């Protein structure tokens, strides 16, 4: 099946990738839904909400500081780099991710759409201020503050991520849906396919006559519409797939 999938990719003009927590789990980042997603006995869905932040911003910030420290230790894995290779080969047009860990960008992906935000970005709860902490070099400063404040207006800063119950950013979502309509192939990597509206992306590709390739350690909500299902770790499968594509080209 690997050779057949490689042939599909090699002959495609417009491929997109749609990635979820599974691709980052291989870099050692706990998934929200897994048993290792717990922090101090709290479930993420108890903390990653606007209500929790309003009730106890310090608790929510402590949770995010813990996640930031964990993610800072993580490195992109072979799956991230394989997607970069496909982009360099001119096959992959964009990566649409549900992850907030910045690993795709760190690996070198150029055209990246982050549907759920980025844990290294902060935004003000009052004014328009936004900041990417890796770019500004202020990660340590934010981690050392009890409650990070906006340098412009002094209001509370919050992580620039999408919390449970919040809408996805319309610009990114519209762009992702547009790419999905135009794509002839989507590579779905490590997503449960349960978080909507993001999970519509493979369905849009399918409805537009495209091919759905899924790479996952287990079956997901996307599997029923997948034309190809490659079971296993993305870090093992994607590099092999890239090798096969190279051989064909």
Curated annotation (Swiss-Prot):
It catalyses: N(6)-acetyl-L-lysyl-[protein] + NAD(+) + H2O = 2''-O-acetyl-ADP-D-ribose + nicotinamide + L-lysyl-[protein]; N(6)-succinyl-L-lysyl-[protein] + NAD(+) + H2O = 2''-O-succinyl-ADP-D-ribose + nicotinamide + L-lysyl-[protein]. Its EC number is 2.3.1.286. CDD domains: SIRT5_Af1_CobB. It is found in: Cytoplasm. The keyword DNA-binding does not apply. Substrate binds at residues 64, 67. GO terms for cellular component: cytoplasm. NAD(+) binds at residues 20-39, 98-101, 190-192, 216-218, 234. Pfam families: SIR2. Residues 1-249 form the Deacetylase sirtuin-type domain. The keyword Transcription applies. Zn(2+) binds at residues 124, 127, 150, 153. Its cofactor is Zn(2+). GO terms for molecular function: histone deacetylase activity, NAD-dependent; NAD+ binding; protein-malonyllysine demalonylase activity; protein-succinyllysine desuccinylase activity; zinc ion binding. Keywords: Cytoplasm, Metal-binding, NAD, Transcription, Transcription regulation, Transferase, Zinc. The active site is at residue 116. It comes from the Archaea. Binds 1 zinc ion per subunit. 2 residues (Tyr-64 and Arg-67) present in a large hydrophobic pocket are probably involved in substrate specificity. They are important for desuccinylation activity, but dispensable for deacetylation activity. Belongs to the sirtuin family. Class III subfamily. NAD-dependent lysine deacetylase and desuccinylase that specifically removes acetyl and succinyl groups on target proteins. Modulates the activities of several proteins which are inactive in their acylated form. Deacetylates the N-terminal lysine residue of Alba, the major archaeal chromatin protein and that, in turn, increases Alba's DNA binding affinity, thereby repressing transcription. This is NAD-dependent protein deacylase. The gene is cobB.
């Amino acid at each position: 099946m690997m050779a057949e999938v490689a042939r599909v990719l090699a002959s495609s003009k417009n491929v997109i990738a749609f990635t979820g927590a599974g691709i980052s789990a291989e870099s050692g980042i706990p998934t929200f839904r897994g048993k290792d997603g717990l922090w101090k006995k709290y479930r993420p869905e108890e903390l990653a909400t606007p209500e929790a932040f309003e009730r106890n911003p310090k608790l929510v910030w402590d949770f995010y500081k813990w996640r930031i420290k964990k993610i800072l230790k993580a490195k992109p894995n072979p799956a991230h780099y394989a997607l970069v290779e496909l982009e360099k080969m001119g096959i992959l047009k964009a990566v649409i991710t549900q992850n907030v860990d910045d690993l795709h960008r760190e690996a070198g992906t150029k055209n990246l759409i982050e549907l759920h935000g980025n844990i290294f970005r902060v935004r003000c709860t009052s004014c328009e201020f936004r900041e990417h902490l890796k770019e500004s070099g202020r990660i340590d400063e934010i981690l050392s503050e009890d409650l990070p404040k906006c340098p412009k207006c002094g209001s509370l800063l919050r992580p620039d991520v999408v919390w449970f119950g919040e809408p996805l950013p319309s610009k990114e979502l519209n762009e992702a849906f547009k790419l999905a309509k135009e794509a002839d192939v989507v590579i779905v990597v490590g997503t449960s396919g349960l978080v909507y509206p993001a999970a519509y992306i493979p369905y849009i590709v399918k409805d537009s006559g495209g091919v759905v390739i899924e790479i996952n350690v287990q079956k997901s909500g996307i599997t029923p519409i997948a034309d190809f299902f490659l079971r296993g770790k993305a870090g093992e499968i994607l590099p092999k797939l890239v090798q096969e594509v190279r051989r064909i080209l």
